[in-house]
Amino acid sequence: MINSQDIKKGTCIRLDGKLYFCVDFLHVKPGKGNTIMRTTLKDVVKGGQIERRFNIGEKLEDVRVERRPYQFTYTEGEHYHFMNQETFDDVIIDKNLINGVDFMKEGEIVDVVSDASTDTVLFADMPTKVQLKVTYTEPGIKGDTATNTLKPATVETGAEVRVPLFINEGEVIEINTTDGSYVGRIRE
């Protein structure tokens, strides 16, 4: 059990029988009354977010989680197979439990988050930024660097990303896996 004022980003709690991760928190001291803790919580299973307020000193059930590096080995329909980097155990994770799955290529290292008490897998987190090669996009025209116009491009994993006009096929780009946005071009 933890007190509500001890909640930080990344804290996992059990609330109404569901697991939530704290995405954001704020201590609020109104002009009158007691201080409250305003939080944004992400449902581990469904992925939705809720806003929740707690009184300071309110007891909450915390869940101890472990993050371990796993390597993506192969896919089998909607199920993805990962190998533990330390014990070489194989773990199967459903596609909808993997954040940033569209940008994952074979051999990618991801963090698998599991409940430490039951050893059940909660979800898998991709690195925030990945580097992928552009396999198809319309050719860029010289001088197309002045505007912020974007065009569609397909990367090596098959995902489609919006990129600036000057990006061409064969170039390596950096992508933010949380929202699928273009970050920059990688020069070799």
From Swiss-Prot:
Gene3D superfamilies: 2.30.30.30, Nucleic acid-binding proteins
GO biological process: peptide biosynthetic process
Pathway info: Protein biosynthesis; polypeptide chain elongation
Pfam family, one: Elong-fact-P_C
Cytoplasm among keywords: yes
Keywords for this protein: Cytoplasm, Elongation factor, Protein biosynthesis
Keyword check for Protein biosynthesis: yes
One of the record's GO molecular function terms: translation elongation factor activity
Predominant cellular place of this UniProt entry's protein: cytoplasm
Superkingdom, natural source: Bacteria
Subcellular location: Cytoplasm
GO CC, any one term: cytoplasm
Family affiliation: Belongs to the elongation factor P family.
Function comment: Involved in peptide bond synthesis. Stimulates efficient translation and peptide-bond synthesis on native or reconstituted 70S ribosomes in vitro. Probably functions indirectly by altering the affinity of the ribosome for aminoacyl-tRNA, thus increasing their reactivity as acceptors for peptidyl transferase.
Record's protein name: Elongation factor P
Organism: Parabacteroides distasonis (strain ATCC 8503 / DSM 20701 / CIP 104284 / JCM 5825 / NCTC 11152)
